[in-house]
Regions:
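Repeated scaffold domains used in trafficking and secretory/extracellular systems
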Residues: 19-20, 58-66, 100-113, 150-159, ...
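An edge-strand/N-cap motif at the start of beta-rich repeat modules
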Residues: 19-49, 272
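Conserved beta-propeller blade signature
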Residues: 23-32, 72-75, 115-119, 166-169, ...
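Short loop/turn segments immediately following the C-termini of beta-strands
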Residues: 33-34, 76-78, 119-122, 172, ...
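Short loop/turn segments that connect beta-strands within beta-propeller blades
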Residues: 43-46, 86-90, 129-134, 181-185, ...
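A short beta-strand motif characteristic of beta-propeller blades
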Residues: 47-55, 90-99, 137-149, 186-193, ...
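A broad "non-catalytic interaction surface" signal
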Residues: 262-463
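A eukaryote-biased signal for long
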Residues: 535-711
Length: 711
């Protein structure tokens, strides 16, 4: 008899009756891995906190649900095929059951009205009345299968709607949203969510929004199943909108949450925006929000927390800390004028990434062309001097801007972030008739190609420096007020070291407003290298193009057997002083882009040792700069160069073969392979050059086979 009693005690352990949760918490709970780990998930921002990595069981717990009535989490131990519950200490207690199937496990479950529901595709919908546990935690509860429940939908989780009492889940294969009758198990197709995958965790909030977490990438999607959206639901319009992009990914996911709680606590630790809701500001609109990390903010004062966005005429500046205006950390030094650059000072509390949008067309959204003005720009702690380009078609008037600063990248103007701050402000824009003109077009690039063996032809492959090149000029009242030069380094097929610069012929450097001009390398602001001591404005993009690349090939992007991505881009924003320069006094595009010898390096036989800036190669018939050594290079009669300053002939042979080319075509030009003469790669080029450009003007459209680099 004693042996029998001991056997019964071992097979049915006594429940310690851990304390339930004190409240209906807003946090979502995510159960992952074996042995199970319990994570707290902020559904608003996507941040996660490990709450417990030892539940007292070396097992996986799945099919979890929160019981609002007794405030326990119930789940299914997939390792040992038994039911468990967890209180606020997250220690799992085994529940005594009868009728629990032993031929399969459960991964789908939730609790509603004190009944635990379990589901398995192909097996059915099961119920467990939990009320016996109210008076005796060691009571045995009965597992019942709902007769006739079809269980055909492939689910990995479902959740109860807090208002209508139905279960909802997404078919992993089709992305279809289904509702389930908890009494009969009947399945009703509602509509296509537009997303597929293993949705291992599902949660509702008190407003009727359904949140699902996808195991593969951790993204959290939200579906509007609120009563206010009844018309769309009835019509099957139930898209799953990406709500958080950085949730926790796992092969074993299940979630539980008190569906009667809002997703934002009254003691919120989240910053929201302030613009009108047409810009997607409120949480219901998936507006921008940042979990306050105590480290990352704009301005001098940390932001305060909000329960939701403050939509105009309300404003966050009237509640708590004025972190949107006086302390917002955003200062426009120059006005926002259409087509021009505006200097803006951004004060950051620490390093991080800035993205920003301005509604140029004033249509109440930030999704227009050119409305994202900064993308993942890396800020330093303290003041950062930046420039943004005002869209040429921006409308005059007051509009909205949104700045987001975070430790995350790839943020949009909506959605959650686990760190930082969002600042929405109104800005004034002026458009007083500025117009733009382009070279070669608004979106295309010309190709610059250089041979650096001048004054010798050598291999004449015209790929020692290849750059893509574009210019945008802004004009007002018959004057050029701004020029922007964009470029990309496409190839370096040189053994010699070369720099690259652009001269604006006849433009006195004093006419450049240096404080309002800038240079970027790979999207990052760097020093504006306007050469000192010159009579004309010369901007040095790079003293050594080779330093701008890292290649595993013999040369960079000149062999089809060794292809690499582009690595270096640049932009020069040149603002002219005063009212600008009259178009009659302004030089024609494409200006004068040229290469020069990198200072301190050898550049070929019979040349001065380490010629540096005294050696240049320009486009044909373009005179060199004042830095060029005319005496030792032109007048010495070196190589095959036939330059003659008295006749205006520069950088061409006696047959008119140049050492530099600029090609404008609908498609970006493909330059010759390494050691392939351009005449071999493009046979019609010879007659084009020797005719002075009169014949074969489309020579670049007729390449020989297998003789050019094909990106």
């Amino acid at each position: 008899m004693r042996i029998t009693t001991l056997s019964l005690l071992l097979s049915a352990p006594l429940v310690a009756n851990a304390a339930p949760f004190d409240t209906c918490p807003s946090k979502a709970y995510l159960f992952q891995s074996t042995p199970v780990q319990v994570w707290g998930v902020n559904l608003v921002t996507g941040s996660t906190t490990l709450l417990e990595d030892d539940t007292g069981m070396n097992a996986n717990i799945n099919g979890v649900g929160f019981d609002f009535q007794d405030r326990y989490i119930y789940g299914y131990d997939t390792t040992n095929k038994r039911l468990v519950r967890l209180g606020q200490d997250f220690q799992a207690e085994v529940i005594n059951t009868s009728g629990l199937p032993t031929d399969h496990t459960f991964y789908v479950g939730d609790v509603y009205d004190h009944v635990y529901y379990l589901y398995r595709t192909g097996k059915g919908l099961f119920t467990v009345d939990l009320s016996p546990l109210d008076t005796d935690p060691n009571a045995t509860v009965t597992v019942n299968k709902i007769a006739g429940s079809p269980a055909t939908v492939k689910l990995t989780d479902f959740a109860f709607h807090p208002s209508d009492g139905s279960l909802y889940g997404i078919d992993n294969n089709s992305g279809g949203l289904y509702s389930f009758n908890p009494t009969t198990g009947a399945e009703t197709y509602i509509g296509d969510t537009g997303e597929t995958g293993t949705f291992g965790a599902g949660y509702f909030d008190v407003n009727g929004y359904y949140y699902v977490s996808r195991n593969q990438d951790g993204k959290i999607y939200r579906i509007n199943l609120s009563t206010d959206n009844a018309t769309n639901i009835a019509a099957g319009i139930v898209p799953a909108v990406e709500f958080v992009s950085n949730g926790p990914a796992s092969g074993q996911n299940d979630g539980a949450r008190c569906a009667n709680a809002p997703v934002v606590d009254e003691d919120s630790n989240i910053d929201f925006g302030d613009a009108p809701d047409s810009y997607l500001t409120l949480l219901a609109s998936n507006g921008p929000r940042h979990e306050l990390d105590g480290i990352t903010w704009l301005g001098t004062t940390p932001p305060d927390a909000d329960l939701d966005g403050y939509v105009t005429p309300q404003s966050d500046e009237t509640v708590g800390v004025d972190d949107e205006w006086a302390n917002g950390g955003i200062g426009f030094v120059t006005a926002l004028e259409a087509g021009l650059d505006s200097k803006v000072v951004i004060e950051a509390s620490t390093t991080g990434y800035l993205s920003a949008w301005i509604d140029w067309n004033q249509d109440g959204s930030f999704d227009g062309a050119n409305e994202q003005v900064f993308t993942d720009y890396a800020l330093d702690a303290g003041e950062n001097d930046l420039f943004l380009n005002v869209d040429i078609n921006a409308l005059t008037g007051t509009t909205w801007a949104r700045f987001r600063f975070s430790q995350q990248t790839n943020l949009s103007y909506f959605g959650g972030s686990t760190s930082g701050e969002v600042v929405d402000i109104q800005v004034d824009v002026l458009n007083d008739g500025a117009t733009a003109r382009y070279f070669p077009s608004a979106s295309g690039y010309a190709t610059l190609a250089y041979e650096d063996n001048w004054p010798y032809k050598a291999d004449y492959d015209m790929n020692d420096a290849v750059l893509m090149y574009r210019i945008t000029e802004i004009l007002k009242d018959g004057k050029v007020v701004k020029s922007t030069i964009d470029g990309r380094l496409a190839a370096v097929g040189a053994s010699y070291r070369n720099g690259f610069a652009v001269r604006l012929p006849n433009l006195d450097p004093s006419l450049v407003s240096s404080g309002n001009s800038y240079m970027k390398h790979n999207g990052v602001f760097t020093d504006l290298d306007l050469e000192d001591g010159r009579s004309e404005a010369i901007f040095v993009i790079a003293n050594d193009l080779t330093e701008k690349i890292s290649t595993g090939c013999t040369f960079y992007r000149t062999s089809n057997g060794c292809k690499e991505d582009e690595q270096f881009s640049f932009q020069i924003g040149i603002t002219l002083a005063g009212d600008g320069v009259s178009t009659g006094s302004w030089t024609d595009m494409p200006y004068d882009p040229f290469i020069f010898a990198t200072p301190g390096y050898y550049h070929g036989e019979n040349l001065p040792l380490h010629p540096g800036r005294s050696w240049e190669v320009h486009l044909p018939d373009q005179a060199p700069t004042e830095a060029f050594d005319t005496t030792n290079l032109f007048e010495a009669g070196l190589g095959v160069d036939d330059s003659n300053p008295s006749t205006g002939k520069y950088f061409k042979t006696a047959e008119n073969h140049p050492w530099a080319l600029i090609v404008t075509s609908d498609d970006e030009w493909e330059w010759p392979l390494e050691y392939v003469d351009i005449v071999t790669a493009y046979p019609e080029f010879k007659e084009y050059a020797e005719s002075g450009g009169d014949t074969n003007q489309t020579w670049y459209q007729s390449p020989a086979d297998n003789q050019r680099y094909e990106p």
